[in-house]
């Protein structure tokens, strides 16, 4: 009787682990990066080590066993296995994934991951490198992040739609709201609150498309166990807001390098 109960408990635990969304997200990543190889891996959850994210790589009955305390740790283990057991490579500039049909068994590895918060990207990175990326390219980048232990990426794709819809609620027309927004290659400077309108106006089709793309990116980041960094409001506003709300405490900033200065809404003003 005890043996039957023990066996039943083992089956339930194994089934529960396989259905765990953290494990499923890692399996999905493996299939995206190395299609058809997912069945050769066995993924398991483990406890953190001394409060730090951790992973293990080993083998069991002809399968590569990856253990981690979350999806990012499992993805890190997968990347380390590819690098140091398969001599494979996943990078921005190309992948070397010439893998044998039957994957080699690894030597046992157990490591912790440095740092609780592993931040990735800044405004310039997104604007200069990723301004024109589509969902296919973003999927590759998100997998690359997870495989390199990133758990807190900057996530500002679609921020232009937040501005657009907010301005429509504050006396701006469609044309005025779109005219305020800079072109995609100059978003970095606008999100850092140095300018407005340069390279614009944005077409409405761009705004609509990037609402969808931004949601896809955040959904995938959350699926992978990341904590996206999103922008709050600091008081930067369109210069034209002073015309819409003449009594608001709005300070026009000095011009710089040929650019007309931006505007700043006083945080003590009720409009803030």
Regions found by a protein language model. Give the residues of each.
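Aromatic-lined carbohydrate-binding surfaces of glycoside hydrolases
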Residues: 36-37, 44-51, 58-67, 71, ...
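Sec-dependent N-terminal signal peptides
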Residues: 4-13
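Bacterial Sec-dependent signal peptides at the C-terminal "C-region" and cleavage site
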Residues: 12-21
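Short, non-transmembrane alpha-helical segments in secretory-pathway proteins
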Residues: 20-34
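Aromatic-residue-lined binding/catalytic grooves and analogous aromatic/hydrophobic interfacial grooves
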Residues: 22, 83-86
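Conserved short beta-strand edge segments in small beta-sheet-based binding/regulatory domains
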Residues: 89-91
């Amino acid at each position: 009787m005890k043996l039957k109960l023990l066996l039943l408990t083992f089956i339930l635990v194994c089934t529960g682990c396989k259905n765990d969304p953290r494990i499923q997200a890692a399996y999905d990543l493996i299939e995206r990066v190395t299609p058809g190889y997912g069945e050769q891996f066995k993924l398991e959850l483990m406890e953190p080590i001394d409060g730090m994210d951790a992973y293990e790589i080993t083998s069991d009955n002809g399968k590569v066993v990856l253990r981690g305390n979350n999806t990012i740790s499992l993805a890190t283990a997968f990347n380390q296995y590819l690098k140091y057991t398969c001599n494979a490579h996943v990078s921005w500039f190309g992948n070397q994934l010439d893998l044998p049909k039957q994957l080699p068994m690894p030597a046992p590895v157990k490591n912790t991951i440095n740092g609780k918060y592993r931040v990735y990207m800044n405004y310039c990175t997104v604007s200069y490198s990723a301004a024109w990326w589509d969902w296919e390219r973003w999927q590759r980048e998100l997998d690359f992040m997870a495989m390199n232990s990133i758990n807190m990426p900057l996530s500002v794709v679609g921020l232009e739609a937040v501005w657009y819809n907010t301005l429509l609620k504050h006396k701006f027309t469609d044309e005025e709201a779109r005219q305020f927004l800079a072109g995609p290659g100059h978003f970095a400077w606008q999100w850092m609150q140095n300018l407005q309108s340069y390279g614009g106006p944005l077409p409405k089709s761009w705004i609509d498309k990037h609402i969808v793309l931004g949601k896809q990116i955040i959904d995938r980041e959350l699926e992978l166990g990341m904590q996206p960094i999103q922008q709050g409001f600091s008081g930067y506003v369109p210069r034209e807001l002073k015309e819409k709300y003449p009594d608001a405490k709005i300070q026009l900033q000095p011009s710089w390098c040929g650019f007309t200065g931006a505007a700043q809404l006083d945080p003590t003003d009720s409009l803030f």
